[in-house]
């Protein structure tokens, strides 16, 4: 196992900080070990990126695109290796990590089109000369990646940032360093010029050193709202720096007037329990009518949830849920469940830590109707679904909006009129009808309002924050106007 895990100025370096490791949360074994980057190595990474900016930005778009497309080819050639690496570090089943690598490949075509359509050249005629809108890169940007999609989500920042002409210092989650290392190795094989993409590994202190670096022109972050808020406060008073945040959610899913109970339960489970509930778009609150249909949906949901297969990511018979990211994350979900029970909630399906030394938990359902007004507005990042029974549709929408977040929301209903009513009143950046709320098109804006973030990270609209527009009025030679303003004589 190599100790050279920091990629700076085109070379791999051993860390100068403290010992760090990555643990497979399913197999409970160490799969990566190194030393974190020191503050001096963070400085070196930023300096390396700064030195590369002029040459990289001066490349034509086609030249930059060629490197990115070569990376895409290498992804395709190494898709099985990368899917297994993601599974080992996150615990996610291989069927799911394979789709993550596929999304990484798909991001390249989306980002190419986005650059041309959203930040390409626009020319407008004028009576004298021409008006142009062009775009320039910010310069040096930091990319902070999350652990739940350690390949796809950082890639959604990195690809459009490189296409726009930025140079990057990438700080991945300390829980998924091996995915980052192997991804950057593919970028290296793609032939990126030295300094264009740098990698620093570490924990909180490494992230703080990078985020606070005075020579950054921007920071692109995907992760928790708590960390995102700290970054937002840190960047206050620095209007010259671009800050793109994609954060958490406390997402509502409302069900009313459906005809197919099994289809409804399927979409609820996909919304709440896919990725062991570790998607920022996962449904956290399920609103069911307080009537016989609501009772039937809940009974079927409980039945199917109890039979969800949880298991190893590489099992021949693939599970729906793998392990959570760590044993600590699993324990935190048990504690969150207990907190809600102490506040007056009722357990319908107990979330259980199946192996205290692993990340395996069973999915849980808890009825919070009796204490919904006192329920903490927290993002419980795991497979725990909170059920609220309602009599009034507008009341359910109001409770769904009663959050500082605003990422995703959905309605399961056979009535389009109800959906239009819901759509006009719900507050979220992603609003779905009769589809799981964890699903979003890579060609559509991805993000939310409130404490779910700003900008629209990791999708087609990422091009917007990777470059800034420049307006120009241009004429081939200096020309004296035919009509002079009053008071001028030539």
Swiss-Prot record:
Signal peptide from the UniProt entry: none
Keywords per UniProt: Arginine metabolism, NAD, Oxidoreductase
Known catalytic reactions: N-succinyl-L-glutamate 5-semialdehyde + NAD(+) + H2O = N-succinyl-L-glutamate + NADH + 2 H(+)
Organism of origin: Pseudoalteromonas atlantica (strain T6c / ATCC BAA-1087)
Lineage: Bacteria, Pseudomonadati, Pseudomonadota, Gammaproteobacteria, Alteromonadales
Protein name listed in UniProt: N-succinylglutamate 5-semialdehyde dehydrogenase
InterPro entries on file: Ald_DH/histidinol_DH, Ald_DH_C, Ald_DH_CS_CYS, Ald_DH_CS_GLU, Ald_DH_N, Aldehyde_DH_dom, SuccinylGlu_semiald_DH_AstD
EC annotation from Swiss-Prot or TrEMBL: 1.2.1.71
Binding-site list for NAD(+): 223-228
